Amino acid sequence: MGTRMFEIRANLENEYPDVYTREALAALDVLAKFDDERKAVMAARTSRRSARFRNKERIGFLDPSATIARTSIKVQDARDGNFVGSEIPKDLQRQWIQGTGPAAKPNSPLDKSIRNIAYALLSGADGWMFDGEDALGQITTMSLDNQRNLKLAIHRDSAFMKPAEQVAAEMNQWAKGFFGKPIIEDWVKQLDFTTKIFRARGLHLEDRQIRSAKGGGFSASIVDAALFLVNNYKRLRQDGCSLCLYLPKIQTAEEAALWSDILSTLEQHLGIPDGSVKVYVLVEQIEATFQLMEIRAALGKHFIGFNTGRWDYINAVSDAMAWDKGFVNPNIDAIVMTYGYMRVYEDRVRRACVTPDKMGQKALWQGGMEPNIPVGSEAGVSAAMKKAVAGAEREQREGACGKWVAHWKMVHIVRPVWEKVGEANQMGRKFPPLTYTKADADGLVLLEPAPRTVRGARDLLSVAMQYGNAFGQGMQAAALKPADFFGNEDVLYLMEDMATGEIRLSILWEWHHKGAAFTADDPDTGVKTGDRLTADLYKRLLAEEYEKLRKASNRDVHDNSKNTTLPIAREIAETYVLDDIKLPWYVDLLNINLNNHDLTEAKRRIRLLADAFRKDGTRITENLDFNK
């Protein structure tokens, strides 16, 4: 191999030869040309955001006469379905329940780490989105452990099969206690049931183990997609499984077109037909909701469906409207999928999915996440499971082909909602065609009356700090609840990932800098209805919630984190919320402190990042410890 367009950190190429294979590295070299284009597209994203703040502008629909960047497709043609999309492969036509979660655990030996995949593939879920993004820890070499584990499982290596047999027995033991019967009959056969899907990291993130040969970061998206597909495509195709990715954080059709170019180039390099790699797009950015059909068209033969999230989308709305003093969210518990702008967003997604393309092909709508876990008191679990089933029933009625769950124990609780109906999917449902009016645009930022309370602020702050702490420990998916409910088994833990941190600090920033009025008195603080979240009040709440976490049991806050990653999480929460310049991503502040437990150094890095963004919109996204 000649001179590469990238370099790999330390001795990792030798430590992970089964991941950094010759074939995978060759593919990365072919795709490396797209990294500069990605950086340009991300710079344009930052410029649009800055312009909205500067000019106090809302996001709008595209000019119907314009051409989608990187394509020859007119916007109006995309809206009319005048493009060629994709048929839905057989193993993706019925996706009633998709589980989500990483394929690795932090600081764990292989036989423990790989168990995550066994739980997933034995769960009975129709599909499992193995996460390389928001739910996967990025400390040390977790991204490589994730890829290694997936390859071992997909290829049925003995390193996977032995733990899988043990996991099957444990799952059945739990099921007998919860359901009164086992959930797995033939564990080896069961491994073939679930469609394997991978979520790559977003275009805005850079890999921690690879950087550009020219210096600076290198696309995490390209690394994730190349390593997963190159190392597994032959076996997946041999087994009759689709090559399927979830693409996160897409904001525009141009970004979707860049993804399409990356995937088509990889397919050509591998010698497989164009469109072999299928993708779902997570609609978690408000700008994407203004360009749904354009995104479908830009991805063309790759695209099979949209997914509707909650936390990430609320965060995107909050960020896009951060300039507008009149736009203030309520407590996030009130922002459910039937609330104002969320209801309008969900409706646009389902209407985009049932719009046929030139060949009459429609797309899948995968519903949102169920974060509950059936662990707690009998009363707490019963109430939470009724709520979870009711949420699934609502989505099924609205036209979703299925939904997500964050834990394998939820599969057999929620899946019967679709199983009873019996239809593989709901692409045949009829909804009104999409329209592009001012009223449509206004609906996407529609606020409705709901509480905004000190209790809500405490919950936001407590969970945000807990999540930042978990992230620093390598657990980007974590079971969390506000500190005031520690020890209360009637209040269940929710399985949360990076989105939970993003939205919580974003809304606290919004409340503080827009002078949001509380809607109820709070006896503990003396806050009265109409009072604001001042800097002094925020610092008081921060200190009180931080102290609760410091005093919490090891079960809720790991003791070894209380003098390492927890103080850093607190520092980030203070800087993010009190800075007058709203930083675009909480994850940036966490990423630059991965593997760093020194608070003084963390403060320096946090200030470095905030000052760089304040100066000219530069995001520090590369691994500052690459040479260590």
Where are these regions (language model features)?
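Expand to "…catalyze enediolate/carbanion chemistry for C-C bond making/breaking, isomerization
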Residues: 2-628
